[in-house]
């Protein structure tokens, strides 16, 4: 038995209509990511991203750790939610899409809040704990 809540098309349409506030940089990043084909399904939705941003804001997070960045959309949302001098440490074991992500972080003016780490997530997590 699944613990997930099934979301029908009416709920998805409502969320898309009323929760996502369009953002040119985010929309461009999503559009370019879709051109990558099947792998694009790894990307979060803009609604999920705005929810993550909200969580970061209301918790007044100064630093965040992200394991797995893909094309950097969740990283961008987290960075937007961080306090002024906050940092997100974005870990990935592949740099395949790093330059792609960096372009959009710079356009969104959050690149100064992002520290990219090229490392296996398990090792990075252990290093952060130690």
Where is each model-derived feature located?
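Short amphipathic alpha-helical segments at helix-loop
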Residues: 36-37, 86
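Beta-strand-loop-alpha "switch" segments that mediate conformational coupling across diverse proteins
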Residues: 29
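S-adenosylmethionine/decaboxylated-SAM
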Residues: 46-130
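Conserved SAM-binding loop and adjacent beta-strand
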Residues: 19-21, 37-50, 57
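N-terminal auxiliary segments of SAM/dcSAM-dependent transferases
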Residues: 1-24, 38
